């Protein structure tokens, strides 16, 4: 079942909240959210974690004051990183999620009955603990699913283990921006390890920034992917609270078909209907359209 989405207040005016969360990820631009209740405010070994309810965006988690997930628009991110490659592949059994401690992506992957194993590897156990407590509407089913394994570990190191070699049909990199502990999840060594952990014919998908404010991420990521994978590319989603409009998602395959071909899109639409997949964002029409790039984004593709 699709998850119920919280709605903003219908009142035209409201009393301003006493506390406001301000995000300043991009130079010269900021977004703010009025907070109604703070649920968690902790500093882990790696980052400052806050979870709070808001007037307009539902429940929100920030890491070092940068929005990571909101209950209102998480599906636009999780659905597209997950279902698009899974439906075009058609036989995904083993999935690894790099990061993703809120388990929103894991929840989507587990909707596919042919999946035998989902392994989520996040370096910050406090993120996992707090998300389990406060984002149950999103992740409660995933935490209870016997196919789900949660590892508190360095995903970069995990990918390099002998036990990870040729293990996964799909690897989803729900990585943060390339700062702090997230730096290791970018660059040639990371992509080489992803390739090594994929089965032949497997796919990987990656968060690749907001092109309006981070255009270089697309060019750099696709250049690096092309060094390790015979086929790779770009597609888009729209996640309102990831400021900047379009969200860039990249893909690569270890010997599989290119994503987004006419044949692949038809295959995915047929599978979507057959398994009666229910999503808040993804559908076959979105799948077909997501590979269309505005000219200014297409110019960023090397």
Regions flagged by a language model, labelled:
Residues 3-50, 223, 244-302:
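SAM/dcSAM-binding transferase cores
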Residues 10-20, 44, 69-203, 213-217, ...:
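The AdoMet/dcAdoMet-binding core of the Class I SAM-like
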Residues 34-37, 47, 156, 233-238:
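Glycine-rich, charged/polar anion/phosphate-binding loops
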Residues 49-59:
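N-terminal glycine-rich anion-binding loops that anchor highly charged ligand groups
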Residues 58-59, 157, 257-259:
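Glycine-centered loop/turn positions within well-structured domains
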Residues 182-259:
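C-terminal substrate-binding/active-site "lid" region of AdoMet-derived donor-dependent transferases
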């Amino acid at each position: 079942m699709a998850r119920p989405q919280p709605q903003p207040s219908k009142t035209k005016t409201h009393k301003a909240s006493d506390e406001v969360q301000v995000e300043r990820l991009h130079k010269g631009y900021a977004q703010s959210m009025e907070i109604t209740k703070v649920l968690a405010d902790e500093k882990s070994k790696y980052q400052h974690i806050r979870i709070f309810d808001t007037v307009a965006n539902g429940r929100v988690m920030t890491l070092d004051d940068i929005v990571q997930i909101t209950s209102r628009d998480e599906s636009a991110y999780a659905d597209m990183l997950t279902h698009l490659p899974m439906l075009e592949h058609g036989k995904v059994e083993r999935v690894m999620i790099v990061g993703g401690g809120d388990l929103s992506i894991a929840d989507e992957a587990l909707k596919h009955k042919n999946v035998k194993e989902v392994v989520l590897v996040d370096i910050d156990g406090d993120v996992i603990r707090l998300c389990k407590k406060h984002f149950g509407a999103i992740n409660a089913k995933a935490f209870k699913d016997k196919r789900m394994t949660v590892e508190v570990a360095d995903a970069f190191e995990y990918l390099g283990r002998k036990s990870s070699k040729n293990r996964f049909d799909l690897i989803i990199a729900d990585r943060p921006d390339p700062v702090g502990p997230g730096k290791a999840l970018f660059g040639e060594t990371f992509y080489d390890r992803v390739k090594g952990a994929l089965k032949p014919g497997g796919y990987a998908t990656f968060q690749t920034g907001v092109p309006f404010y981070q255009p270089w991420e697309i060019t750099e990521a696709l250049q690096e992917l092309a060094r390790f994978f015979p086929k790779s590319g770009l597609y888009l989603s729209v996640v309102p609270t990831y400021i900047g409009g379009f969200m860039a998602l990249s893909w690569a395959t270890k010997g599989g078909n290119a994503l987004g071909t006419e044949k692949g899109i038809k295959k995915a639409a047929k599978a979507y209907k057959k398994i009666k997949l229910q999503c808040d964002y993804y559908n076959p029409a979105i799948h077909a359209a997501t590979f269309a790039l505005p000219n200014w984004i297409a110019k960023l593709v090397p």
